[in-house]
């Protein structure tokens, strides 16, 4: 059995403080855990994962895994030594992301673009809403 919890109240997390994100994610996982017996929690958000995993792992006895930017495989697979990272501004600026780059991609040129708007457009697309191509072009123009 799987339970999917989405925080549509505080979404997106990319512009929120680390303290807010940790408190919010711990609060949500606690609420779910009180209603359902959890064997594992997956934090399926780069921003939330990069800041909340230590607190979650300390609080809960079940395993907690997260998703983080795929720097390691991207660095291994790039043909030209350039890796692009599209993420929230929070993920782009967090020390955890820099540590991934230093550890796994120090020979690569990493081009990062942080945008809350991309998150909102991706979620809109998942809900079947149209995503204007011109809007994507505007957001990606700095790249």
Question: Could you say what each language-model-derived stretch is?
Answer:
Residues 1-143:
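Non-catalytic structural scaffold of enzyme domains
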């Amino acid at each position: 059995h799987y339970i999917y919890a989405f925080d549509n109240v505080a979404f997106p997390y990319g512009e929120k403080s680390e303290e807010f994100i940790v408190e919010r994610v711990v609060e949500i996982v606690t609420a779910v855990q009180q209603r359902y017996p959890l064997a594992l929690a997956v934090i399926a958000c780069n921003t939330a994962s990069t800041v909340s995993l230590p607190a979650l792992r300390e609080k809960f006895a079940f395993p907690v895994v997260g998703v983080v930017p795929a720097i390691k495989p991207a660095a291994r697979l790039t043909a030209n030594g350039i890796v692009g990272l599209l993420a929230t501004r929070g993920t782009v600026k967090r020390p955890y992301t820099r540590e991934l780059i230093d550890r796994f991609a120090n020979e690569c040129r990493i081009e990062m673009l942080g945008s809350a708007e991309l998150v909102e457009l991706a979620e809109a697309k998942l809900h079947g809403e149209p995503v204007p191509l011109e809007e994507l072009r505007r957001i990606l123009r700095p790249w």
